[in-house]
């Protein structure tokens, strides 16, 4: 916490010493909308890879970064979404997005126990999950934060930075590093031939989103994966997508 509070720093040399001797902190958050099921599923793979991966990248992360994985930010919403899916799925999953097991009934799984959208609460702090999460984030003061979501199945993959106009209340350093991360991620997607887009509908003006942490100095990356509503969907182009774990729902 000393580096995050300038009042505790004596001079620039103190800050540089902390930077050299202290590992970076990354905060990986998943499942703030309970009906975006693949987000939490991905968190388990990320945690396993970081803990057990023997590749060079995983080893370097373990040696140099403290990674905090928050795998399920909205457990009540996820349980409600899974209950609706089990209720309406039938013997054979229907890929039509208008079928009942995709649309469900109110209250859907997006909100928490009180049906509140937790991804709108980060300056209001009206919900217990948000208050606990903000307390933990202020304790760890991550340099990198990731928020993972799902979007409609006919989309591809979205990641930061946001569309213009850019938020002038975020530091020039933030805008610089978010571009560096985006360019690196774009190259990785290009190597695999994966479709993606960026600088589109995403904005980072509203301080109630998870990316409020950018105001505290973190580089905040949003990931939006095309979803399959927990089971199987037929896209507009006729492609059928499956959730890899839906038979176990």
What are these regions (language model features)?
Residues 17-38:
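Short HxH-centered metal-ligating active-site micro-motif
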Residues 127-129, 193, 227:
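Metal-centered catalytic cores of metalloenzymes
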């Amino acid at each position: 916490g000393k580096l995050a509070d300038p009042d505790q720093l004596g001079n620039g040399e103190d800050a540089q010493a902390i930077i050299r001797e202290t590992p970076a902190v990354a905060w990986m958050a998943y499942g703030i909308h309970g009906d975006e099921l693949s987000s939490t599923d991905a968190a388990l793979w990320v945690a396993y890879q970081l803990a057990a991966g023997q590749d060079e990248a995983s080893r370097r992360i373990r040696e140099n970064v403290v990674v905090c994985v928050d795998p399920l930010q909205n457990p009540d919403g996820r349980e409600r979404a899974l209950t609706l899916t089990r209720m309406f799925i039938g013997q054979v999953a229907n890929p039509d997005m208008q079928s009942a097991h995709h649309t469900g009934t109110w209250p859907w799984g997006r909100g928490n126990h009180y049906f509140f959208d937790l991804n709108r609460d980060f300056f209001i702090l009206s919900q217990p999950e948000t208050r606990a999460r903000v307390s933990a984030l202020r304790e760890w003061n991550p340099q990198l934060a990731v928020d993972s979501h799902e979007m409609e199945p006919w989309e591809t993959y979205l990641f930061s930075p946001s569309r213009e106009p850019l938020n002038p209340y975020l530091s020039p350093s933030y805008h610089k590093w978010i571009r560096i991360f985006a360019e690196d991620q774009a190259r990785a997607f290009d190597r695999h031939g994966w479709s993606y887009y960026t600088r589109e509908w995403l904005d980072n003006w509203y301080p109630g989103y998870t990316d409020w942490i950018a105001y505290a100095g973190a580089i905040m990356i949003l990931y939006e994966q095309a979803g399959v509503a927990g089971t199987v969907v037929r896209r507009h182009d006729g492609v059928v997508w499956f959730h890899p774990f839906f038979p176990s729902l």
